[in-house]
Amino acid sequence: MKLLISNDDGISALGIRTLANALAEVGHDVTVVCPDRERSATGHGLTLHQPIRAEIVESIFHPAIKAWACDGTPSDCVKLALWALLDSPPDLVLSGINQGANLGTEILYSGTVSAAMEGMIEGIPSIAFSLTSHISRNFQPAAKFATILVEQLAAKPIPDLMLLNVNIPPVEWEEIAGVKLTRQGVRRYVDVFDKRTDPRGKTYYWLTGEVLEEVEPPEGLNLPQNVPIDVHAVKDNYISITPLQYNLTYATALDKLSNWNFPMS
């Protein structure tokens, strides 16, 4: 298969190198276009008021891989690849392997998920891969599963245009409990802004924080209650696969709001 791979951790990240090399080694046609530096939590931002530059990168990836480092956002990278760098569209757009989870409401901030979302917006099935640890450097189990999943999709394509958000627990392959199709949960954080002063006396802030709670999604979303939540599945050492779309319409609210009146005079 022809694969486009991006990320938000940057060109030097071990996760994207492990993923791209694993897929190239089994014969896939792999192209990498990703940020030239760390771009985590940039969401779906695009660069509009300055030029975007991309340079070919050698000696980082498998010899069969063509790679570019781009000074834009993850979404910039995918858009640039699809419209300017590639000769023809890929069969799949992949993003990751991210260093850290992309679960629940985190996906709204995620550059990893947004890169894959950009592929889906352009009509290409896409997958975001994340290792649910900021510490573990063992991306091999995640890359192994990615290879299995891509091979499966080559034989049996995704039935509808969608994004698969895949989170892999940070354990050895033998310790993975299995794979679960999941629904998006909620992750809430205690946000802390660390206030500091620079040498010129100007105030600046560092955003820090930690997970406060992992809770059920709000009621009324019309989600199947018999499907497990992503954050719970990963806690139990399952690989979580959540199908996503870019349409954010709150469908059940349309009926709830249908009796509203909007007098214009």
Curated annotation (Swiss-Prot):
Key word Kinase present: no
NCBIfam families: PRK00346.1-4, PRK00346.2-2, surE
Cofactor note: Binds 1 divalent metal cation per subunit.
InterPro entries: SurE, SurE-like_Pase/nucleotidase, SurE-like_sf
Keyword Metal-binding: yes
Reaction(s) catalysed by this chain's protein: a ribonucleoside 5'-phosphate + H2O = a ribonucleoside + phosphate
EC nos: 3.1.3.5
Annotated residues for binding of a divalent metal cation: D8, D9, S40, N98
Superkingdom of the organism of origin: Bacteria
Cellular component annotations (GO), alphabetically ordered: cytoplasm
Source organism: Trichormus variabilis (strain ATCC 29413 / PCC 7937) (Anabaena variabilis)
Sorted UniProt keywords: Cytoplasm, Hydrolase, Metal-binding, Nucleotide-binding
Enzyme class, broadest EC rank: hydrolase
Cell compartment(s), UniProt: Cytoplasm
Family, similarity comment: Belongs to the SurE nucleotidase family.
GO MF term (any one): 5'-nucleotidase activity
Cofactor: a divalent metal cation
Function: Nucleotidase that shows phosphatase activity on nucleoside 5'-monophosphates.
Protein's UniProt name: 5'-nucleotidase SurE
